[in-house]
Amino acid sequence: MSGKVEINEPLIVATSAPLRCNCTGGSHFHGKTIANRALGSSQLMKCYSGLLKRCVRREKYIPVSDRGFLDAYTPQTAPGIVFTGSSLVTDSTLMMAPFNFHRQHVLPLEENFGLERARGDVTVDIRTDTDEAVARGLRSDMYERDAVGHIVSKPQKRTTGEMLDELMMTARLSHGNLVRFLGGVACEETRGGKITVKMVELGLCNLDEFIAEPHWIAPKFAIVRQYTLCKLERDTLSGLEYLHMHGVVHGDFRGAKVIVFPTADDFTFKVNLGESTSLGIAPALSRAPYHRAPETEFTGLIGREADMWAWALTMYRAHTCKDFFKKGDPSEPYRVLGPMDNDALDSRRTGRDGDPVNPEGFGTRLEKNATAVDGGFIGLMGKCLALYPQFRPTARELLVYPRYATLHRISGPGPAPPPVIGAAPAVRVVSNAVEFRSRWGVRPSPAMDPRLEARTSWGKNAVRAVGDFTPSFLYREGGLGDTRPGNKRAITLSRGTLRSYVGTENRLTTEIHRSGGADIVLHKVVGRRPDISRANLEYVMKVSNGFPEWYITIDHYTVGVTNVHLYVGYITDDIVYASAIGLSCPLRVDILKGFEKSTLRVDLMGILVTRGLAYTLRVIRHLKSASIYEAGPHAVGLVFVNPSSRNRFGTVSCDSVKLELGDEPSQLITGSR
């Protein structure tokens, strides 16, 4: 028996890549090849050479003198595991076709593992504490013994039904650009843990490994690279379009989830399903996706639109071999992409030293990365990186772009349409004498989940869509609130209610107050010309909504002497969190006419993040001049009580804040004092 097996997801690449240099032979890599890379360099080179010859025949502008390297180039086979073709060879125990389940008991991982092989084969002992795994997956590790791959499964705290649903979904999805499912195994660990093993076809490598190959950056193969990138984009879009059309969200699209397959003298790119979900919009994975869309970052939700965000960033990494955004900074997308939106905020961020820091901008980031990316892709990337999910294109919309219409000149006609998904296979599994039947089914679904469609402010509404939330202390017997609409109870925050001063981080000063039977955490931004920017605003939203189980409310705007003050607050259990940001923007612009005072209900947060600061100031001035105080039932608001003192920066500050608690956490209060 030869070959190796891939369990559940692509084999993981080593943590560090060889160093890069610019020698006379062109930009390439030096150093030791990654030992555990599931990569066949000779097969890659064969595809490269064959594809390049086909490109040369069609691209007449390549000088004849530049084609001699084809005969002089000698491929070097990298050490490590070499796979040929796309076949999968594995233990007979796991050869389940077309779709069956096998219950097998395994030992705890900290002890020696005995893999019982079917049909009388001897037991192979693997010591997980000393033997080095040749590959590691999310739920399984693979060990090599006598040139044979053996699987050690990791117990999971999952129900049999969840395992069955995952395998059922994978088995019923079939497309030329999805990694093909070969079989599944459901197991029970001796201590009661549930595990699942999903067998899929094995390609040459994943995309992250592919772009680390010397061939990818060699100047000789520039024309192959240009064509391959275009085909990579089309193949992955085709796979995502099929998933989205059938109500499946990938959830963690990245380079490790794109598998490279050789097809004659060409490459085919297939999407590995990973931990896809059958829901239109689903709770985020237990581990954060590599490319987190804004709605995932701030609401913990994953939808099709998040897949398109991740697709654009993954393709950019394939083009440039580097990430577009810096990791670990949730405000990055807003600093870079904020100016791309309609009527973007034209205010300046202020650093710790008070110097203005302008938003970076999309084009500036491209220049900083020093990359020459195909202009055709940059246009699509910009569309997919819209901050608001409802503005991003779908995979189907991108596939009709002219960029992908000319691929047939080299690669032939497009892939045949996938077969129609049939009825669910009659499969069941019995665990502890309790039978479970999967009720999962592939179903068509709209292009966008209604919980994110046509929303001005996706953060507040997406969280609200998850479920109704009622702050418990508002409705507790003998508590602060009154269930009758319109009744509000005021809480005043002052120096007397201050319990502790937490400190200042990222220009946010944090204080904890105790008033009215509730703990109130107040975040304040203070500084010379503390103008709000999109990055500052969204950072406070991040602070206020760092956990999906917390309900965010964006509450109250009021006008001080020369400052406009924005508050962001959220409530969880018996704790009220509020954030204050100061704006020292004079109100000089006249407001447009047309507001009906009797029915006025203004979402200033939505106006601010979609129409810009100048337009928002017009609205605020109109509200102030008309003395309008529109507060629906259940409103939560913050207003300044004593905006009289001045701080050392010369701007107005407030010694006390009044918090008005009402009945509806999602309703805004607008008006003036």
Swiss-Prot record:
Record bears the keyword Ubl conjugation: no
Q: Where is the active site?
A: D252
Q: Which organism is it from?
A: Ictalurid herpesvirus 1 (strain Auburn) (IcHV-1)
UniProt name for this protein: Protein kinase ORF74
UniProt catalytic activity = L-seryl-[protein] + ATP = O-phospho-L-seryl-[protein] + ADP + H(+); L-threonyl-[protein] + ATP = O-phospho-L-threonyl-[protein] + ADP + H(+)
**Stretch list, region Disordered:** 340-364
Q: Which residues form the Protein kinase domain?
A: 128-404
A Gene Ontology biological process noted in the UniProt record is: signal transduction
The record ties this protein, via SUPFAM superfamilies, to: Protein kinase-like (PK-like)
